[in-house]
Amino acid sequence: MSSTRFQALSELHERKAIRNEIPGNRVSEYFGNNVFYYHKMREYLTDDAYDKLMECINTGARIDRQTADHVAAAMKEWSIQKGVTHYTHWFQPLTGTTAEKHDSFFKPLTDGRALEKFDGSMLVQQEPDASSFPSGGLRNTFEARGYTLWDPTSPAFIVGNTLCIPTIFISYTGHALDYKMPLLKALHAVDHAATAVCQYFDKDVNKVAVTLGWEQEYFLIDSSLHNARPDIAERVMAFMQEFEYESHLLGIPVTTRHNEVAPNQFELAPMFEEANLANDHNQLVMDVLEKTARKHNFRILLHEKPFEGVNGSGKHNNWALSTNTGVNLLKPGKNPKTNLQFLTFFVNTVAAIHENADVLRASIATVGNDHRLGANEAPPAIMSAFLGGHLSRMLDDLEKNIKAGKMTPEDKTDLKLNIGKLPQA
């Protein structure tokens, strides 16, 4: 055993950083090149098809078959120009990672020729084998079929020579077999409830989106040892640079990188995005991390608690509610009216955490998380809301001073005093 370890250490010392050639010095020159974003849709779609797709994305309207055919043709043309040969419905089963079933654009004809085919029916639905994935008891053993259904709110992207189409994953009976469908339902419910409240303050608000900014922690270990290593700082930087380049090609706005507490533990973070897209990007990031690490003779450890006695890795996220008019509903305002709106959402968020802590905890329950939570590191195993001293005192004052259940003009005037300050950490 010791000779194997020494041999691995010797091999590790001989390894050099692998440099990846990144074209140009401006990220803006290649950011999102492998993503079928809205500006690219405009290039490949008719005005009518583009408008109908935007209506589907923005309002949830059903998309007709003709429009789906137009979108499929546009995706095929764009992706084939970039060297793509296959497409896949990219989904998020109950495994904590993603899954794919690849199909070729290539279709043989009866006269011996062939063509590339991709139409609306192939875009909208696929049928992977649901028996290959956990179901939580929602799928009968004799109902092996599962269905993936296109999620138009998250843009398609290219990995290698494959066009990846974000989808939900459901059973033969229509039950969710993934993490995306419950998320989309929750986002719709929050939008509906928050928009109704916002209408009391601003009639121009017709949509509230949940925004999400996540962090991904990970351990990076040399593949020849996997559990021990000498210093590899130069190689880590080369790995990070290539990983960020590959992420930017996929439209993932990674902006932050730094060391974490444990030896050879690191963290990355992107700019916040709409929550469904941010969730997709986090799933995609883990795959990019794995593939890039192997090119640099590393192994990525994404497990929440890979080492005993050493702090683990986690996904910390910062979420908010944003209206279509650009207002962050969880940010204190600058006048009594906007502060009253902030307080409305603020106190209801705290109440929701208090009343639904068990459901919130259950939604993040995994074996890995159970190993980590409460083990002398953040976060603890309880669900709590830390408000900071300033906001706590403000709520105490409101509770003490407003006795009749209604706010006097003086109470409303007081709302403009100091609430706009940042809560203390």
Each language-model region and where it sits:
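Positions that flank functional sites
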Residues: 71, 94-95, 262, 308, ...
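N-terminal hydrophobic targeting/anchoring segments and the immediately downstream early-domain regions
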Residues: 1-24, 141-157, 162
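Glycine-rich, acidic/polar active-site loops that bind/position phosphate-bearing ligands
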Residues: 144-302, 311-425
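Short, surface-exposed, charged/polar-biased interaction segments
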Residues: 84, 100, 108, 136-139, ...
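A cross-family glycoside hydrolase active-site/sugar-binding cleft signature
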Residues: 64-68, 89-90, 118, 269-271, ...
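Short N-terminal helix-initiation segments at or just after the protein's N-terminus
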Residues: 2-7, 25-31, 50, 260-267
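Histidine/acidic residue-rich metal-binding segments in metalloenzymes
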Residues: 12-120, 124-140
